[in-house]
UniProtKB/Swiss-Prot annotation:
Gene transcribed to yield this protein: lppJ
Name of the protein this chain belongs to: Putative lipoprotein LppJ
Coiled coil residues, start to end: none
Cell membrane in keyword set: yes
Paired cysteines (S-S): none
Organism of derivation: Mycobacterium bovis (strain ATCC BAA-935 / AF2122/97)
Length: 187
């Protein structure tokens, strides 16, 4: 009988460990929000009833990036543009995305606050739009969300600007990022 009690405890311990390992995986899947592709959607990330052309989706994030570079006087800027799917299948709708890196001057926390203050003075709203969650410093304005954090090279900051999920062109097989550094930096 003692042997069966030990076996039972071992089996229960294994089941508990398995449940503890699987629960976060299942919870992660539950957090993925389905973004329906339907006309007249009330989903704040998708208004495919009023789609943006490729040029409009690009301008939606490139213009604010230019303004941020100028307003915060960002130095050694490098930037790229791409279309990002708004779902985990890689299908439409898409949003325009700008990823830019910039040289940090002095303490990174203080410099991020300098950039944040410059953005706030140009009409950006502190924090993400309602219903969205990000790590790092996040601001939003006119359907664009900007998220700022340290780059892998800690002498640089990184900002990612995401537009609205309103581009219905299929960019599923696009695999290039367009270098837009020259568009953001004034000569």
């Amino acid at each position: 009988m003692p042997h069966s009690t030990a076996d039972r405890r071992l089996r229960l311990t294994r089941q508990a460990l398995l449940a503890a390992a699987v629960a976060p995986l299942l919870a992660g899947c539950a957090l993925v929000m389905h973004k329906p592709h339907s006309a007249g959607s009330s989903n704040p990330w998708d208004d495919s009833a009023h789609p943006l052309t490729d040029d409009q989706a690009m301008a939606q994030v490139v213009e604010p990036a230019k303004q941020i570079v100028a307003a915060a006087d960002l130095q050694a800027v490098r930037a790229g543009f791409s279309f990002t799917s708004c779902n985990d299948q890689g299908d439409p709708p898409y949003q325009g995305t700008v990823r830019m890196a910039f040289l940090l001057q002095g303490d990174h926390d203080a410099y991020f606050q300098h950039v944040r203050a410059a953005m706030l003075s140009h009409g950006w709203i502190d924090g993400p739009p309602p219903g969205q969650y990000f790590h790092g410093i996040t601001l939003h304005k006119n359907g664009v969300t900007a998220n700022m954090s340290l780059a892998l090279d800690h002498s640089y900051g990184e900002m990612i600007l995401d537009g609205e999920c309103r581009n219905t062109t299929d960019h599923h097989h696009d695999d290039e990022t367009t270098n837009i550094t020259n568009q953001l930096v004034q000569p």
